[in-house]
Amino acid sequence: MAVPKRKMSRSNTRARRSQWKAEAPTLVKTIENGKVVYSMPHRARVVEDAAGTPLYMEYKGRKVADV
């Protein structure tokens, strides 16, 4: 196992850790039933009826799963 030669200072430790940050997800704007909906690209979406009841999941215009 690798062992550091010298103790790493608090500022250097924090500077290194500051590079580990989460990115905001990429969202795609679509219009469904007259409403603007933001969703993640390349994901199956849930198709709902007018009452909001989930019917099935769809990907690239094809039904892929029942909900």
From Swiss-Prot:
One of its GO terms (molecular function) is structural constituent of ribosome. GO terms for cellular component: large ribosomal subunit. InterPro entries: Ribosomal_bL32, Ribosomal_zn-bd. Residues 1-19 have a biased composition (Basic residues). Pfam families: Ribosomal_L32p. Residues 1-21 are annotated as: Disordered. Keywords: Ribonucleoprotein, Ribosomal protein. This is Large ribosomal subunit protein bL32. The lineage of its organism: Bacteria, Bacillati, Actinomycetota, Actinomycetes, Micrococcales.
